[in-house]
Regions:
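Sec-dependent signal peptide recognition
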Residues: 1-8
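Serine-dependent carboxylesterase/thioesterase catalytic core
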Residues: 52-69, 86, 90, 257-263, ...
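A generic local structural motif
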Residues: 243-245, 276-277, 313, 370-372
Length: 405
């Protein structure tokens, strides 16, 4: 929370001394915001107090003396209102019209429906976290913009787990909560700042307050090196980590940009690369970032098979998805390359026809080894980006590290 807002809330309790005009102007909003934070007050009354604070701040958004403080109070009220409504009584107040009363004042609140033009469906998310509460220790550059609205991380975590959802945290997204008022009628809109960097608030287009790093930093961070090492050395304990994971809700209008890590690594290695993609408005408007994770102690051909199977599931679930761009580092480049390569049994004659014939004489059509060694290029792969990929093999495989496999 900004120091200016902390000072405003502190002064809200000081009724015995006169306030400067610029602070007196938004004192009522600060008082209501402070009262709304009381956990001993009923949730419905707290929600009404948050609306009162937001409405009073809303009226001052264009005030020359108070607009900065008013914006901070408005943003805080919008953030805390969403957190309260979504979490109270298992979401009983969420995504339905509400009539809320506090201090003799009655408010009517409605939720704006989601659409394809930058507004989230309120029912999409199972929980929210204030973006300001997410730790950013693993993020090199904090990617955010200052503006109007409550900056949140929207989380969708279902049970049973949905396809392509990260297993621990679920799918996350940047969300900005905006409240608009007509008298005592309020509309709560959840804006996707990735698509709409601005919103109309109080009749004017205003830049949204948004945090694009927090949804990425929300995912639990484990030791990348040790997790990657164990995935290389104790494969059987890490088979369940294999999968394709969407880090954002699926968007049919954006290109899947799929990152594939290398040897002794995990998808966490890409967090700051993805953060840089999200930093660029043009890139984040064009691409949606996914990751493929796998224990690197498995043969690359097997990991490539699992990757093919995951991409086949995407095509089945989202047949109209845009063609993919794959980014592979080291071994991940080999795994990615095999998605755009066709290999049949005849291709294996390069090792010698007799050897190939002997090998395939023991392989049944359609079994695991057959599917891992013969396959067709995926027509949905539009582009490949290789980073330090040993296309012609690596001398490392001949040494002690190679013997581990």
């Amino acid at each position: 929370m900004r120091l200016h807002l902390l000072a405003t809330l502190a002064l809200a309790g000081c009724v015995s001394q006169p306030l400067p005009p610029e602070e007196a102007e938004h004192r009522a909003a600060a008082v209501h915001l402070k009262e709304a934070g009381s956990k001993t007050t009923a949730a419905e009354q707290r929600a009404a107090l948050y609306l009162a604070s937001a409405a009073e701040s809303y009226d001052l958004l264009d005030s020359p003396k108070s607009r900065e403080a008013a914006r901070e109070l408005y943003n805080k009220a919008a953030t805390d209102l969403v957190l309260l409504l979504r979490s109270s009584d298992n979401g009983a107040m969420w995504n339905r019209p509400l009539t809320l009363t506090s201090g003799g004042t009655t408010w009517r609140l409605r939720y704006a429906a989601g659409n394809r033009n930058g507004t989230w469906d309120p029912g999409r998310f199972t929980s929210f976290t204030a973006a300001s509460e997410v730790g950013l220790k693993t993020i090199d550059v904090h990617n955010r913009q200052d503006g109007i609205g409550g900056a949140l991380v929207g989380v969708r975590k279902m049970n049973p787990k949905e396809p392509f959802a990260p297993p621990i945290a679920g799918i996350t997204a940047p969300v900005t909560a905006v409240l608009d008022f007509k008298g005592r009628d309020a509309t709560l809109t959840l804006v996707d700042p990735s698509e709409e960097p601005k919103a109309r608030v109080k009749g004017s287009e205003r830049t949204l307050d948004a945090d694009f790093s927090a949804p990425l930093a929300y995912y639990p961070q484990r030791s990348e090196f040790w997790t990657g090492l164990m995935g290389a050395l104790r494969v059987s304990h890490h088979m369940g980590t294999t999968g394709l994971y969407m880090l954002q809700p699926y968007d049919p209008d954006r290109i899947p940009l799929i990152f594939v890590h290398g040897l002794i690594s995990t998808p966490q290695m890409w967090r700051n690369v993805i953060n840089e993609v999200e930093k660029d408005p043009e890139l984040r408007g064009r691409y949606q970032c996914w990751v493929f994770g796998y224990p690197t102690g498995n043969p690359p051909a097997y990991s490539a098979l699992r990757f093919r199977e995951e991409l086949a599931k995407v095509r089945e679930l989202y047949p109209n998805a845009k063609d993919y761009v794959l980014v592979g580092h080291s071994m991940g480049g080999l795994v990615s390359r095999m998605q755009a390569t066709t290999i049949d049994r005849e291709a294996w004659n390069v090792i010698g026809e007799d050897k190939a014939a002997k090998f395939f004489s023991k392989v049944k059509k359609g079994d695991l080894i057959d599917r891992a060694t013969t396959f067709e290029a995926n027509p949905k792969v539009a582009r490949l980006v290789f980073i330090c990929t040993p296309h012609r093999g690596s001398e490392m495989a001949l040494g002690s590290i190679g013997e581990l496999g």
